[in-house]
């Protein structure tokens, strides 16, 4: 395989939007994280729903995970 015949890889996400994605994703993740903590503190053991807890925690962790991923890309740690 010749080097000249290869096509250069381009990222599907423009590096100029890494800061915006970081802030938006982390903000959404922090919202769901705060909602989870408020739900845990204000509900009694009789009114808690484990499926609702798992759903909120899953959504929060997904947004926080992708937010941290784009934060690392933003600061130059390419993972």
Swiss-Prot record:
GO MF term set: oligosaccharyltransferase complex binding
Topology within the bilayer: Multi-pass membrane protein
Pathway assignment: Protein modification; protein glycosylation
Gene Ontology CC annotations of this record: cytoplasm; endoplasmic reticulum membrane; membrane; oligosaccharyltransferase complex
InterPro entries: TMEM258/Ost5
Major site of localization recorded for this protein: membrane
Keywords per UniProt: Cytoplasm, Endoplasmic reticulum, Membrane, Transmembrane, Transmembrane helix
Domain of life: Eukaryota
GO biological process, one term: protein glycosylation
Transmembrane region(s): 17-37, 59-79
Protein localization: Membrane; Endoplasmic reticulum; Cytoplasm
Pfam hit, one: Ost5
Protein family according to the UniProt entry: Belongs to the OST5 family.
Function summary: Subunit of the oligosaccharyl transferase (OST) complex that catalyzes the initial transfer of a defined glycan (Glc(3)Man(9)GlcNAc(2) in eukaryotes) from the lipid carrier dolichol-pyrophosphate to an asparagine residue within an Asn-X-Ser/Thr consensus motif in nascent polypeptide chains, the first step in protein N-glycosylation. N-glycosylation occurs cotranslationally and the complex associates with the Sec61 complex at the channel-forming translocon complex that mediates protein translocation across the endoplasmic reticulum (ER). All subunits are required for a maximal enzyme activity.
Subunit structure: Component of the oligosaccharyltransferase (OST) complex.
Name of the featured protein: Dolichyl-diphosphooligosaccharide--protein glycosyltransferase subunit TMEM258
Annotated source species: Danio rerio
Gene it is expressed from: tmem258
């Amino acid at each position: 395989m010749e080097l000249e015949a290869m096509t250069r890889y381009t990222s599907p996400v423009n590096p100029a939007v890494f800061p915006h994605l970081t802030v938006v994703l982390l903000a959404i993740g922090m919202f769901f994280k705060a909602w989870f903590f408020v739900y845990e503190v204000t509900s009694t053991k009789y009114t808690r729903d484990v499926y609702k807890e798992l759903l909120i925690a899953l959504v929060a962790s997904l947004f926080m995970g992708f937010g941290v991923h784009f934060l690392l890309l933003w600061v130059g740690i390419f993972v």
